[in-house]
């Protein structure tokens, strides 16, 4: 069991007794965005995006650092200019790790070494959703973007939802589903970016992104509405 705290620490706990097995600590900048990224476990390793713009790979059994690489290094005169938090969900396909930051950076690094493979100047505080061919994200202005995961080149762009505070898009039967601040759930075609449908499922923003289980989508609105539904064109 792995737990991450707001003070830059990551704990590995024994699954049978809950006792601490290892501890990793990182330096937290004086000013950071609220929230932390969720550690991503894959192939015996734990990948974590940190508040200082680093990505670290840990051995999940003992917490030993396999590599640590600074991938988001904003420069500026003020602490706000230098914000480099990696707070969103990451993705892994084969030997590539995909990371996005509110500092307008999305990038790919090699899982074996931490080597930077490419960088794109569009980022998201909520992170990325990854398919075999593309990366999808809703940036800080709620512009939805498709990015080629092999080289970082930009695909389609949707600007219809600007300033609607979109959640991270999630896959649903070949489409993308995401929510907004007004309680709406939106569906778009993942390949073309065509807007397919929308439906109001609450009166406020949602807690996190939609959760997909099989052919059912679950959303939980801050007005207390929990919804399970299916979608078909």
Each PLM stretch: what is its role?
Residues 201-233:
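Blade-level signature of beta-propeller repeat domains, shared across WD40, Kelch, NHL, RCC1
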Residues 14-18, 60-63, 110-113, 148-151, ...:
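Short loop/turn segments that connect beta-strands within beta-propeller blades
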Residues 1-25, 36:
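A generic tandem-repeat structural signature
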Residues 11, 56, 107-108, 145, ...:
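WD40 beta-propeller blade core
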Residues 134-146, 153-187:
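Loop/turn-rich, solvent-exposed surfaces of beta-rich toroidal or solenoidal domains
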Residues 5-6, 50-51, 94, 101-102, ...:
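Structural signature of WD-repeat beta-propellers
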Residues 19-43, 68-92, 116-131, 155-173, ...:
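Extracytoplasmic beta-rich repeat domains
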